[in-house]
């Protein structure tokens, strides 16, 4: 068959490093004289001399020129194997390769032996001192014919996608006079053009091959000691390795190049600038596409220069996402078939650092006493009492274990519970006491641990902010007093309270009761809380003013907040802590009351303590509201200009309920016709009076009318009702033509400042704004109170700060009863812990669906509101 060869070796045990395509004719080989031994220098710098082998019928390798078939005219071009071994060799894809290219290719490289081994029985070669290799004549070997096996060379054609070499020795026929070091593939056509001076193996110059030429892959060793190396594996579409994965294409040859392939013809690129790299693109196989003995070399050359590296983006993404699999581990079986192994250890190190931080702190807390140091304590900003949790009565251990397996969305504070204390574990108290008593101990210990966290935050506020001379120099004494008020007195009161709580805990790890301590300090020590909460209005306004108008204050404040002791928390989060703490105390004490047996003497003491803390909360709320309302009244009164009979606005019993701008549709009579106009009005609604004004500027309003609140009637109206009404007037028609997007309602003033009845058609910008105005204006109407047991309950999952008087400020874990909801995203509700009503956005709340939890919340609200104090 054309293009095939019958290969004969001089010994069965010799591993040849060349390929045969055809058997040259006897007259072409035997009719030549023996030339002088040729010496040449290999590309790696080693001088090599080929000596003739004194054996009958054998020739030197240098005498047989290589015949290179060409596809254009089916002629053969004779080349010297020595020249091919020293120069770059042409391959089927039009590129060139040098003998040392196998060192860069993990699939084609083999280990080099330090010296030539001695002859062994069976016809192995022997290396004498002069460097000549004597090849004994073996018996005639069989002739290899197609179909080809993995041990036979495959012709390199453009249809094949992978080129390789054999891995097992093939016998060579000596009867035909072929040398063991010969490499002269034959062509299907005997006509050809011979090279000049074939005896010396010279070639005029490098032969440029086109992309259509079919060139066999020819390899010769660059050193003597490579004669016994095992050839690489044939990786072709017909090899067992390729057949193992089915009829998949490995890679196209056009991609196996170091240089960037452009759209233009690249055949003019210098051959020495191109390096062929063939590598399997198949990943995830059970084993590599080669022999086991070559696995180590495949791994060693993964990152060799010129190698084909693909999939870097996807690999780096997987490395950033998939954590826990070591891509760089030498034991990883997946590494052998990966195209690229980018080193991204930084991602894994950061993950280990931050993921282990919580576990380290948790272990430190579990094995220590109650409070061993501030470095392990949690600031009160990050502390969440279980008493505020709607599921606090349920077992939380399985829930915590389940949440650890998932991504934690909200910050989970690291703190100890009573069951986690080392003394409790050592004595086994959590297993010996009843479940109800254990929950009671947890509730008592939560008061102590939360007070410790709260005290720590107060000390940071005083040490880092209040006592900072640099910060004090940026503001006046009045501003500093409004900003920090009596925070030092509040901190001292908290310290006294905590000292007694901690002493009770140190006396006995099994705490009997703390209700007496809470009752005593609430009645006598916590008076500074009322003063501090009363100053809240001035505090907030002063801070906003300093941040807006004082750059030096803002710069120093930012520097202090970034200090590690402040843990990157803003100063405002420290300033509001006393208000947060005083409002949480009733819930903590109520939890203890629930866990205390009602027939026990401790229950009565606990109820008295709950009543005292509820009274404290009421005093703080009233003080804050009174100061805010009084200041607001004076501010508004100074901005009003009465064009009519003045109204005495300032009063200690009056406060602002809602304010805002609305669109009024007014009907005027001109001569014998009516005209409807649209104008903007600004309402100031107080708890007992409505002031109707027209806005002149941001701080100036002209009063047009006013009326007592009990003289107002409000009603909602829709577009359909207005258009279908038989008594539709011109103002309604004006609305239909010009303001179809507005949300309308009617306001009837039974008696205004002139004892006249006035009807107004008003429009709001949003549906929720209309609902809020209707609720505020009609709040005094005698409506029966809704049944709280039938109301929807929601839990606050995001804190919300009120920006208008009718809005409700909420903290995380607050429970609110919903009275009405608007489709554009607002709730009106009542806060469970103190009965305050107001509006807040839906996105801050999550509906409670568990009926048992709803019933418990209703019972708790009844207990808190039944203490004859507004908690």
UniProtKB/Swiss-Prot annotation:
**Its quaternary structure?**
Interacts with ICAM1 and RHOG.
Identify residues that carry Phosphoserine. Answer: 22, 392
Q: DH domain: which residues?
A: 439-623
The name under which this protein is listed is Rho guanine nucleotide exchange factor 26
**Pfam families, per the entry:** RhoGEF (PF00621), SH3_1 (PF00018), SOS1_NGEF_PH (PF22697)
Recorded GO MF terms? guanyl-nucleotide exchange factor activity
Q: Specify the SH3 domain's residue ranges.
A: 789-850
Tell me if Phosphoprotein is a UniProt keyword of this record: yes
Q: Which organism is it from?
A: Homo sapiens
Q: Where is this region: Disordered?
A: 1-49, 86-233, 288-310
């Amino acid at each position: 068959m054309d293009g095939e060869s019958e290969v004969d070796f001089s010994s069965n045990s010799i591993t040849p490093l060349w390929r045969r395509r055809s058997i040259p004719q006897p007259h072409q080989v035997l009719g030549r004289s023996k030339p002088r031994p040729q010496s040449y220098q290999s590309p790696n710098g080693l001088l090599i001399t080929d000596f003739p082998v004194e054996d009958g019928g054998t020739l030197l390798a240098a005498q047989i020129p290589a015949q290179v078939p060409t596809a254009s005219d089916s002629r053969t071009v004779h080349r010297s194997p020595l020249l091919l071994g020293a120069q770059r060799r042409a391959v089927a894809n039009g590129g060139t390769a040098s003998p040392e290219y196998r060192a860069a290719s993990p699939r084609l490289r083999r280990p080099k032996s330090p010296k030539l081994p001695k002859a062994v029985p069976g016809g192995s070669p022997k290396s004498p001192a002069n460097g000549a290799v004597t090849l004994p004549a073996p018996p005639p070997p069989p002739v290899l014919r197609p179909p080809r096996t993995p041990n036979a060379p495959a012709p390199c054609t453009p249809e094949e996608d992978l080129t390789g070499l054999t891995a097992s020795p093939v016998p060579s026929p000596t009867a035909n006079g072929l040398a063991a070091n010969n490499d002269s593939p034959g062509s299907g056509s005997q006509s050809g053009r011979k090279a000049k001076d074939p005896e010396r193996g010279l070639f005029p110059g490098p032969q440029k091959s086109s992309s259509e030429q079919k060139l066999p892959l020819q390899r010769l060793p660059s050193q003597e000691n490579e004669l016994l190396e095992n050839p690489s594996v044939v990786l072709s579409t017909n090899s067992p390795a390729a057949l193992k994965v089915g009829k998949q294409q490995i890679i196209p040859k056009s991609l196996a190049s170091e240089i960037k392939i452009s759209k233009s013809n690249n055949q003019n690129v210098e051959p020495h600038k191109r390096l062929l790299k063939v590598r399997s693109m198949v990943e995830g196989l059970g084993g590599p596409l080669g022999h086991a003995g070559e696995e180590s070399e495949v791994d060693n050359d993964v990152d060799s220069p010129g190698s084909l590296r693909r999939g870097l983006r996807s690999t780096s993404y997987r490395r950033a996402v998939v954590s826990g699999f070591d891509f760089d581990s030498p034991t990883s079986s997946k590494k052998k078939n990966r195209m690229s192994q980018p080193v991204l250890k930084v991602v894994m190190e950061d993950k280990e650092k931050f993921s282990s931080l919580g576990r380290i702190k948790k272990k430190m807390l579990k094995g220590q006493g109650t409070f061993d140091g501030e470095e392990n304590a949690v600031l009160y900003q990050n502390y969440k009492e279980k008493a505020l949790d709607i599921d606090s009565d349920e077992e939380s251990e399985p829930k915590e274990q389940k949440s650890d397996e998932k991504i934690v969305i909200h910050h989970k504070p690291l703190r100890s519970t009573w069951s986690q204390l080392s003394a409790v574990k050592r004595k086994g108290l959590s297993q010996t006491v009843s479940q109800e008593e254990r929950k009671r101990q947890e509730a008592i210990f939560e008061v102590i641990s939360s007070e410790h966290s709260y005290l720590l935050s107060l000390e940071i506020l005083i040490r880092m902010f209040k006592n900072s001379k640099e910060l004090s120099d940026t503001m006046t004494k009045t501003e500093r007093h409004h900003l920090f008020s009596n925070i030092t007195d509040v901190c001292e009161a908290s310290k006294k309270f905590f000292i007694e709580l901690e002493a009770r805990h140190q006396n006995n790890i099994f705490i009997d009761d703390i209700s007496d301590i809470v009752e005593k300090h609430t009645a006598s020590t916590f008076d500074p809380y009322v003063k501090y909460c009363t100053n809240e209005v001035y505090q907030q306004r002063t801070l906003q003013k300093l941040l807006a108008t004082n750059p030096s204050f803002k710069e120093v404040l930012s520097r202090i907040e970034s200090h590690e002791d402040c843990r990157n928390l803003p100063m405002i989060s420290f300033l509001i802590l006393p208000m947060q703490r005083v409002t949480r105390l009733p819930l903590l004490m109520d939890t203890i009351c629930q866990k205390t047996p009602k027939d026990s003497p401790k229950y009565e003491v606990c109820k008295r303590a709950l009543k005292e803390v509820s009274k404290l909360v009421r005093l703080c709320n009233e003080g804050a509201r009174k100061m805010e309302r009084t200041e607001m009244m004076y501010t508004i009164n100074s901005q009003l200009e009465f064009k009519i009979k003045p109204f005495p606005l300032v009063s200690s019993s009056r406060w602002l309920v809602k304010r805002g701008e609305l669109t009024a549709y007014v009907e005027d009579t001109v001569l014998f016709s009516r005209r409807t106009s649209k104008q903007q009005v600004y309402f100031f609604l107080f708890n007992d009076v409505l002031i109707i004004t027209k806005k002149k500027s941001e701080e100036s309003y002209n009063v047009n009318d006013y009326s007592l609140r009990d003289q107002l009637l409000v009603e909602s109206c829709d577009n359909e009702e207005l258009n279908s009404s038989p008594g539709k007037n011109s103002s309604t028609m004006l609305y239909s033509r010009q303001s179809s997007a507005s949300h309308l309602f009617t306001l009837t003033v039974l008696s205004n400042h002139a004892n006249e009845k006035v009807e107004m058609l008003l429009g709001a910008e949003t549906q929720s704004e209309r609902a809020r105005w209707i609720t505020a204006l009609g709040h005094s109407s005698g409506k029966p109170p809704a049944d709280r047991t039938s109301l929807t309950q929601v839990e606050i999952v995001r804190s919300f700060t009120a920006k208008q008087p009718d809005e409700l400020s909420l903290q995380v874990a607050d429970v609110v009863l919903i009275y009405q909801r608007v489709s554009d995203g607002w709730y009106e509700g009542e806060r469970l812990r103190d009965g305050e009503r107001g509006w807040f956005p839906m996105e801050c709340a999550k509906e409670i669906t568990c009926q048992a939890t709803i019933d418990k919340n209703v019972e708790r609200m009844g207990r808190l509101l039944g203490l004859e104090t507004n908690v």
